[in-house]
């Protein structure tokens, strides 16, 4: 246990001088004496000086304070004791429910599983959300990104997915709140409590008001807990909200560490940092990690380096669109922009594949005809195009669905729609079985039976 002293403080970055024969290794955790602060070594500057990031507030720290090297990376509690608890980046409980009852702790920096250890699978994960199950189905053990700008419904979609999957799936879940609003973390906790699934979820929060060190490492803390469950042979769900804030924290830290910024001011190590995190989120022969990540898209620009880097790692992408949200269609998933590796007739079956592609064709054609309709009106279209437009508008409305987690806002009770019912409903619309129903009947309903009932009342 070598000790050193603080020689410089720049915001969240602190330089510590050690004797030259006992300089701590990269990623070692250091403890500041007389303060609660933990530091993580990022660079060795030479002459016994290391540059560190503070995992917590740097208020009250000053030059000359003693710092002790713990000789290991930051470690966090893992295992069943973490379920139902809220923890911070260091694994300390922040829910005022006493200490976490476990001896076992794992370091947050771990190697990704080797190629030989990894296992792939084609099992589908049913979410009960029509548009997702139809157009961008999730794979069990896959990675999913929810992309969207500010206020189009990433977190609400995420909470609905957690609710549906946690209740239907009955496995363990880990939720990492990375740089999001504390209010959302609070809502989320109560939502889990009310749904009686809190005893299956471990919650790790590093919210918006935390220093960049916490926001940078909290995703790794959550991932480490998920890896422990996976290695015990479980199928785990890992939810990260929001992966963009992880990148942003890296940007803040990178500038303070004195690295030269790259495109749009991001850190030069953006792709590597993202890779280190994403490569660990994988399924092995022991168990699987299915991860669902919300990705904030700055200024609705999907070509921004941060979302663009994230795209490369995902199996399915759910793109939320402001244009669709402005039509009042929620979830505001863009069925033409969202994709999945699972959308393959050999994986999901021919019927599902044909229905999904049929829906996309009709919506794409409607999009092309919109300009003609805007200039010349519906009357100038051929009969087949008129029919197609009518079906497209029904499909568009049928892609909406009331959510359980939004019941308090909308007053409409949530709906879980099985994959079988989803395919049957859209197939019927494509085949013209419901051409006689008004399009309002398809808005904000669950299965097609409900639309038929609703039409009778209109």
UniProtKB/Swiss-Prot annotation:
GO terms for cellular component: plasma membrane; proton-transporting ATP synthase complex. It is an enzyme of class 7 (translocase). ATP binds at residues 148-155. It comes from the Bacteria. Its EC number is 7.1.2.2. The keyword Chaperone does not apply. It is found in: Cell inner membrane. It holds the Pfam family ATP-synt_ab_N. GO terms for molecular function: ATP binding; ATP hydrolysis activity; proton-transporting ATP synthase activity, rotational mechanism. It is a peripheral membrane protein. It catalyses: ATP + H2O + 4 H(+)(in) = ADP + phosphate + 5 H(+)(out). InterPro entries: AAA+_ATPase (IPR003593), ATP-synt_VA_C (IPR055190), ATP_synth_F1_bsu (IPR005722), ATPase_a/bsu_AS (IPR020003), ATPase_alpha/beta_chains (IPR050053), ATPase_F1/V1/A1_a/bsu_N (IPR004100), ATPase_F1/V1/A1_a/bsu_N_sf (IPR036121), ATPase_F1/V1/A1_a/bsu_nucl-bd (IPR000194). Keywords: ATP synthesis, ATP-binding, Cell inner membrane, Cell membrane, CF(1), Hydrogen ion transport, Ion transport, Membrane, Nucleotide-binding, Translocase, Transport. Belongs to the ATPase alpha/beta chains family. NCBIfam families: atpD. Produces ATP from ADP in the presence of a proton gradient across the membrane. The catalytic sites are hosted primarily by the beta subunits. F-type ATPases have 2 components, CF(1) - the catalytic core - and CF(0) - the membrane proton channel. CF(1) has five subunits: alpha(3), beta(3), gamma(1), delta(1), epsilon(1). CF(0) has three main subunits: a(1), b(2) and c(9-12). The alpha and beta chains form an alternating ring which encloses part of the gamma chain. CF(1) is attached to CF(0) by a central stalk formed by the gamma and epsilon chains, while a peripheral stalk is formed by the delta and b chains. This is ATP synthase subunit beta. It comes from Pseudomonas fluorescens (strain SBW25). The lineage of its organism: Bacteria, Pseudomonadati, Pseudomonadota, Gammaproteobacteria, Pseudomonadales. The gene is atpD.
């Amino acid at each position: 246990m070598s000790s050193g002293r603080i020689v410089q403080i720049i915001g969240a970055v602190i330089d510590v001088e050690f004797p030259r024969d006992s300089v701590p290794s990269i990623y070692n955790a250091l403890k500041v004496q007389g303060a609660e602060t933990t530091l993580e070594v990022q660079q060795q500057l030479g002459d016994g000086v290391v540059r560190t990031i503070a995992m917590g507030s740097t208020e009250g720290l000053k030059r000359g304070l003693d710092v002790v090297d713990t000789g290991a990376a930051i470690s966090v509690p893992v295992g069943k004791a973490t379920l139902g608890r809220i923890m911070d980046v260091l694994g300390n409980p922040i829910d005022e429910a006493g200490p976490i009852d476990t001896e076992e702790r794992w370091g947050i920096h771990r190697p990704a599983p080797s190629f030989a250890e990894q296992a792939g699978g084609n099992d589908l994960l049913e979410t009960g959300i029509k548009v997702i199950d139809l157009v961008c189905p999730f794979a069990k053990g896959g990675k999913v990104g929810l992309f969207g700008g500010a206020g189009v419904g990433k977190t609400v979609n995420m909470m609905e997915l957690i609710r549906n999957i946690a209740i239907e799936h009955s496995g363990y879940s880990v939720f990492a709140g990375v740089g999001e609003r504390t209010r959302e973390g609070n809502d989320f906790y109560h939502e889990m409590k009310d749904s009686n699934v809190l005893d299956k979820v471990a919650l790790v929060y590093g919210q918006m008001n935390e220093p960049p060190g916490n926001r940078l490492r909290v995703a790794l803390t959550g991932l480490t807990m998920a890896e422990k469950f996976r290695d015990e042979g479980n199928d785990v769900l890992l939810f990260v909200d929001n992966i963009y804030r992880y990148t942003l924290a890296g940007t803040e830290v990178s500038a303070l560490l004195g690295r030269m910024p790259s495109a749009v001011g991001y850190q030069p190590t953006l792709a590597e940092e993202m890779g280190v995190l994403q490569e660990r989120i994988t399924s092995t022969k022991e168990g699987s990690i299915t991860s669902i990540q919300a990705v904030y898209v700055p200024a609705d620009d999907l070509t921004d380096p941060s979302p663009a880097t994230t795209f490369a790692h995902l199996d399915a992408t759910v793109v939320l669109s402001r244009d669709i949200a402005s039509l009042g269609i929620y979830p505001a998933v863009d069925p033409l922009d969202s994709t999945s590796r699972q959308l393959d007739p050999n994986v999901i079956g021919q019927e599902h594949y044909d229905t999904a592609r049929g829906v996309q064709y009709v919506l794409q054609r409607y999009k092309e005809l919109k300009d003609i309709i805007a200039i010349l009106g519906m009357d100038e279209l051929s009969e087949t195009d008129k029919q197609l437009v009518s079906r497209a508008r029904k499909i568009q409305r049928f892609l909406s669905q009331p959510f359980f987690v939004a019941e308090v806002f909308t007053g409409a009770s949530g709906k879980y729609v099985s994959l079988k019912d989803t395919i049957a409903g859209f197939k019927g619309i494509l085949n013209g079985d419901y051409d006689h129903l008004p399009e309002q009947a398809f808005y904000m309903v669950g299965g097609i039976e409900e639309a038929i009932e609703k039409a009778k009342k209109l």
